[in-house]
Amino acid sequence: MLEQMGQAAKAASYQMALLSSREKNRVLEKIADYLEANAEEILLANEQDLLEARRSGLSEALLDRLALNPQRLHAIANDVRQVCQLADPVGQVIDGGLLESGLRIERRRVPLGVVGVIYEARPNVTVDVASLCLKTGNAAILRGGKETWRTNAATVKVIQKALEECGLPAAAVQAIESPDRALVSEMLRMDKYIDMLIPRGGAGLHKLCREQSTIPVITGGIGVCHIFVDETAEFAPALNIITNAKTQRPSTCNTVETLLVHEAIAERFLPELSRAMHERGVTLHADARALALLSGGPATAVAVKPEAFDDEWLSLDLNVKLVAGIDEAIAHIREHGTQHSDAILTRTLRHADRFVNEVDSSAVYVNASTRFTDGGQFGLGAEVAVSTQKLHARGPMGLEALTTYKWIGYGDDTIRA
């Protein structure tokens, strides 16, 4: 089955690569319209997925991530329309010039070809990834989580209908509908057809892809994010930033998980932190010194387990650790961070510069929330993932990250001397 899907996707990718921006936008507009026109079918499939998910005992937080309603589906359709408004990077000349040999050379952006995406739980990812791949002239093979396989199948059916209405191959967007996990391992070895693989899920999925894939893999999305509160930080704005970074959407990968506090301000700062976190229902997991200062406060405070510094909470829980200064803060982030998003709150420019230069994460912030690590917030439009590695793409992956480039030489019967 996957062999046939790969062959069809590769053939479709050649056709998609030749489309003009206008032709691609026409497809996207039709997809957005069809999502709304076929809302009843998609929402019915989602209801069936939710019913089965409840029977299997999924938490309410996960059920909310799975759920669609007319408003959410309308928002997803509008997201597709927003992709239409983004500048098309395909065909852009990155650089080039006339060489001494007389050859005119240019480096031009082109589609990757076939993009494979393995993801869990979120039905909106199906449309997000498909729209970004189509905008960049790529084909896509999608493998969503078993929790939303009916929703994904119904959504892809609508996308394929829109493609065919525009005279394009339905195979430009395909979904692996079977929940059989053995198919994931098979997909990881489809380097003959898939040019880049993007896993969007937990640490286990990323580890599986890194270890077993014969396809280049873009990993990321695991966010053990830190905020270091320096001794010169102003308390009121610092608490506002921490509250935003922890409580705005606790289940996201750019949510802060560990707070590092300079020991010189701990006695004054931690009681205020306790009050702020209590108002939002946050449980504090503190090291011994921090726990002693937090124990009399209103927020629930417990002793932190050592392994908690290496894991995402993705909930209203926050690690708190006291550090002697910026050196210890940077050392902790290097040992426990995932190179996603880390921030310093300080009024000392020298410390801000050191943090920016020495913390090796895909996004580093000074006096700002880690929640900004997002394609839309960065002005990239939509994103296909957040990469925490260094090759090909890093940070929020917008349209450019779904392209590569080729060198093109124009000669006048030119030969090499």
From Swiss-Prot:
CDD domains registered for this protein in UniProt = ALDH_F18-19_ProA-GPR
User: Which reaction is this enzyme known to catalyze?
Assistant: L-glutamate 5-semialdehyde + phosphate + NADP(+) = L-glutamyl 5-phosphate + NADPH + H(+)
What Gene Ontology cellular component terms go with this record? Answer: cytoplasm
Which compartments is it annotated to reside in? Cytoplasm
Q: Superkingdom, according to UniProt?
A: Bacteria
Instruction: Report keywords, A-Z.
Output: Amino-acid biosynthesis, Cytoplasm, NADP, Oxidoreductase, Proline biosynthesis
Supply the EC number(s): 1.2.1.41
One biological process term from GO is: L-proline biosynthetic process
Q: Which cysteines are joined by disulfide bonds?
A: none
Q: Which InterPro entries match?
A: Ald_DH/histidinol_DH, Ald_DH_C, Ald_DH_N, Aldehyde_DH_dom, G-glutamylP_reductase_CS, Glu-5-SA_DH, GPR_dom
A Pfam family annotated for this chain is Aldedh
The Gene Ontology terms for molecular function here are: glutamate-5-semialdehyde dehydrogenase activity; NADP binding
- Describe which pathway this protein belongs to, using the record's wording: Amino-acid biosynthesis; L-proline biosynthesis; L-glutamate 5-semialdehyde from L-glutamate: step 2/2
- On whether Amino-acid biosynthesis is a keyword of this UniProt record, the answer is yes
Function, in words: Catalyzes the NADPH-dependent reduction of L-glutamate 5-phosphate into L-glutamate 5-semialdehyde and phosphate. The product spontaneously undergoes cyclization to form 1-pyrroline-5-carboxylate.
- What family does the Swiss-Prot or TrEMBL record give for this protein? Belongs to the gamma-glutamyl phosphate reductase family.
Q: Which PANTHER family match?
A: DELTA-1-PYRROLINE-5-CARBOXYLATE SYNTHASE, GLUTAMATE SEMIALDEHYDE DEHYDROGENASE
Q: Which HAMAP family match?
A: ProA
Which NCBIfam families would you find in this protein's record? PRK00197.1, proA
Q: What is the protein name given in its UniProt record? A: Gamma-glutamyl phosphate reductase
Query: Native species of this protein?
Result: Cronobacter sakazakii (strain ATCC BAA-894) (Enterobacter sakazakii)
